[in-house]
Amino acid sequence: MPLILLCGFPCSGKSSRSQELQEHLEQSGRKVHIIGDHVLGVDRNAVYADSREEKDLRGSLRAAVERKLNKEDVVILDSLNYIKGYRYELFCLIKHVQTPHCLIHCITSPEVSSTWNQHRDKNEQYNQEIFDSLVQRFEFPDSRNRWDSPLFSVHKDEKLPLEQICNAIFHRKAPPPNQSTQMQPLSSTNFLHELDKVTQEVVTAVLSAQKTSIPGDVIMVPGASEKVQLPRILSMSELRRLRQQFISYTKLHPNENISQLANMFVQYLNQSIHG
């Protein structure tokens, strides 16, 4: 079912709007998934100070969105979504999945957002340098762009246009897929070989380590600095299913850095089994 994107300055009310949307949709019997930085438990100041970490975060959010998109549920992406190129990537994703979407721009002034930021708990605040940088880098949505449309721009004192949002996501046809979203972009035999090999090694390591592990343990796997966080014992069939999902996703969104495949798969496993 549909994807709802939130965008806006840091501390512009996106999470409050997401919760308001969730409550409204659940009252009508819809199942809603909210995905965002807070769900992944990231350190915002560390991530947004490092372009590589920020890129990894966007990839993790996109992967989490793709896992939840189906024919029944509504997915809300509660994040900055401040880069128009990233919003375009998500638009391509919904075209591939064949589901509608909309964008909600939470409008505040930098001064108001800065004040709201300062009133947050210390561990949830952006430091001022990061905050100012994100405000400066924000790329405003434009409803003339198909990836930013339909667009709902909501000021801080305005009510969400809930009826119009529901009409946009439930009574509008999904954008048709085009050749670029249907094509498999991979042609590198070496990449495919490494993808298959690395993911199989991780699965084998997890199955082996589980024999002497208990829920709550962390498992080291070959080729990864990330560790698998084990909330419960995972069956071979579940691991095989998650491995196949990861391979399918990575074929559509290839990463040139083969050395990071193991870490990416471990992150995918952790997000899937804890989600």
From Swiss-Prot:
Cited PANTHER family: PTHR12435
Signal sequence bounds: none
Family indicated by similarity: Belongs to the KTI12 family.
GO biological process, one term: tRNA wobble uridine modification
Residues annotated for ATP binding in this entry: 8-15
Assigned keywords, A-Z: ATP-binding, Nucleotide-binding
UniProt protein name: Protein KTI12 homolog
Domain of life of the native organism: Eukaryota
Molecular-function GO terms, alphabetical: ATP binding
